Amino acid sequence: MILSFVLGLFASIARSELSVPEAAAKMMSLYLLFAIGFKGGVAVAGHGIDGHLLAAMAGGIALSFLLPFLAFALLRMSTGLSALDAAAVAAHYGSISIVTFVTATSVLSAQGIASEGYMVAVAAAMEAPAIVSALWLVARSGAGVRMDARLWHEILLNGSIVLLVGAFLIGAVTGEAGMDRISAFVVAPFQGVLCLFLLDMGLVAGRGLRGARGVISLGAVVFGVVMPILGAVAGLAVALIIGLSPGGAALMMTLAASASYIAVPAAMRVALPEANPSISLTLSLGITFPFNLTVG
């Protein structure tokens, strides 16, 4: 799987004509979100809702809300970014990359390492709190923030969140009976689809790396590598406090280390239209995403 990403990354940097049609990439992302959400719901149906699930949700939400404050402080100290741009970037690093999460889940499964199925719900819960804390940081700096219905619509009804949570609920309601009916769809093709999707993400990340020159400083590049490490450490601390299994701890670390490039950019376009989106996307998709997939 990771080699598929590396292939796409190399092809993009080498300026190969290799490409994946946008419609195909969209379909693969929809499939992966549905499959991982459904399987997580089935796991919860067999496990039941208990204190561990609620504690994991609370820990994930706390991480998502607090990590932007650390990211904001590091960005202001190590880069020349304005408070507005630093807060926008910080929101990306408090939220999560669902693709990184799906990849980590697949890697654990391939190695026979079990993890808590409800971590899918934790992932969905960690999308929005970072946006709220980033907007608070901007408001504190005196800049204008748009907190209107359109913003909350972007935060709460983002397509990836709706599909992930919806599939999770379907899996939780139907349980093993539902899995028996569609296992040929959500289980067997998963690894192959993920490989093709990671190939496309490698192509996208390569384009981000090519465009990084002139957009971000050396300090920002260092931040893009250091911040996920600090996030992973924070995620491990929360996992140990909660008492997650080794697989669950690895997923919590993955969530805390990743950076959003889907849900948060859409919200930032509404809430902080003056912020420079190329900085956030170059860091999250061009630096942190390939670092997490190849090294992390």
Task: Describe the role of every protein-language-model region.
Residues 1-45:
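N-terminal signal-anchor module of multipass membrane proteins
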Residues 43, 205-208:
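Solvent-exposed, amphipathic alpha-helical segments
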Residues 1-10, 22, 49-206, 213-217, ...:
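Alpha-helical transmembrane segments of multi-pass small-molecule/ion transporters
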Residues 25-28, 216, 220:
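Membrane-interfacial loop-to-transmembrane alpha-helix junctions, especially the N-terminal start
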